Amino acid sequence: MKTKPSLWLMVIMLMFPQIVETIYSPVLGSIARSFSVSDAQAAQTLSVYFLAFALGVVIWGVLADKWGRRPTMLVGLLIYGSATFIAMQTDSFTILMLARVFSAFGIAVGSVVTQTILRDVFSGHELRKVFSLMGIGISISPVLGMLLGGQLAFAGGHQLVFLALFFIALVLFVYNLCQLPETQQVKPKIALGCLVARMFKDRQVLLSALLVALYNVALFSYYQLGAFIFSDLGLDAEQFGYSGIALGLGSLIGSFLNKRCLLNRCHSVRCFYWQHCY
């Protein structure tokens, strides 16, 4: 019998990487001022974050099969928390960049391992309903991240944001240490090279990857540049944070439509078009 983790924990672990990405955006102006760097240099701390996050998704996915889900999750959270603490303490922009790389690499564990755990314990229509619930949580994440980031940036700049992230990471690490079960039943032997080759030959996989990539490019371009545009317009970080409401609304509507389609067993193509209207 499979041991099922708390669904609320799984929702939080999927939401946290999204919150981490968006909570940082309102403090880019504070980063530029505090470290005496240009806006473009401050924005690079987000660019390296996204690259390291993508690398982390691949590596943590492999390690989750090799080490198990629970130890992989704990190691990733430990790396993230340590890197965030360093980012909070440093006065060097170079160290900040390195800390951002390691924090992104670490927190990627929340995205990939959580989904792996869900696939361990759910299947079929039940799995689709669970992922629909997760989608609603993820769609709310940018709103929470932008709003919280705007308020923290206005109150205490980037150091207060990093302090909040470190505290959340510490709480999640302790909770996972105490409550997260190991859901891996067997350790599969996967020929990674053959799997990658099959994925690159699958037209549907490539189209889905392209769609996700285009969505993320559009969204993260706003996270990277929006704070500076608002500043040029005479608006502060707190006001920039409120713009996250508009960003999250479309994703939230799409997630609700997806859940409705799954409950009513609508045709997948029709569901796809309805969701992406938003």
Where is each model-derived feature located?
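Membrane-interface helix termini in secondary transporters
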Residues: 30, 61-62, 66, 151, ...
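Cytoplasmic helix-loop-helix junction between adjacent transmembrane helices
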Residues: 99-140
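Extracytoplasmic gate region of multi-pass secondary transporters
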Residues: 205-244
